[in-house]
Amino acid sequence: MKIRPLGDRVVIKRLEAEETTKSGIVLPSSAKEKPQMAEVVAVGPGGVVDGKEIQMQVKTGDKVFFSKYSGTEIKVDNEELLILRQDDILGIVEE
């Protein structure tokens, strides 16, 4: 199944968090926070939000940081994804 987000929404897939700390301590699943870094899977067309035209600044494949409590979690083909507004993306990771 493929998801096509509407308006200024973006579909992202969380990137896995480190399982060990810098000092070598292995973290159990219950102690790990959900990562705030993700890969963009799909991007909406943009549009008008609150009377302003929104240009999409991210594209599929970008790695991004996003706000901790933003978006809606969904499950598609046994894959956990998140749909959020472009405003909830804090920055694009450039390598």
Curated annotation (Swiss-Prot):
One of its GO terms (biological process) is chaperone cofactor-dependent protein refolding. GO terms for molecular function: ATP binding; metal ion binding; protein folding chaperone; protein-folding chaperone binding; unfolded protein binding. It is found in: Cytoplasm. It comes from the Bacteria. Pfam families: Cpn10. Its main location: cytoplasm. The keyword Plastid does not apply. Keywords: Chaperone, Cytoplasm. GO terms for cellular component: cytoplasm. The keyword Chaperone applies. Heptamer of 7 subunits arranged in a ring. Interacts with the chaperonin GroEL. Belongs to the GroES chaperonin family. Together with the chaperonin GroEL, plays an essential role in assisting protein folding. The GroEL-GroES system forms a nano-cage that allows encapsulation of the non-native substrate proteins and provides a physical environment optimized to promote and accelerate protein folding. GroES binds to the apical surface of the GroEL ring, thereby capping the opening of the GroEL channel. PANTHER family: 10 KDA HEAT SHOCK PROTEIN, CO-CHAPERONIN GROES. This is Co-chaperonin GroES.
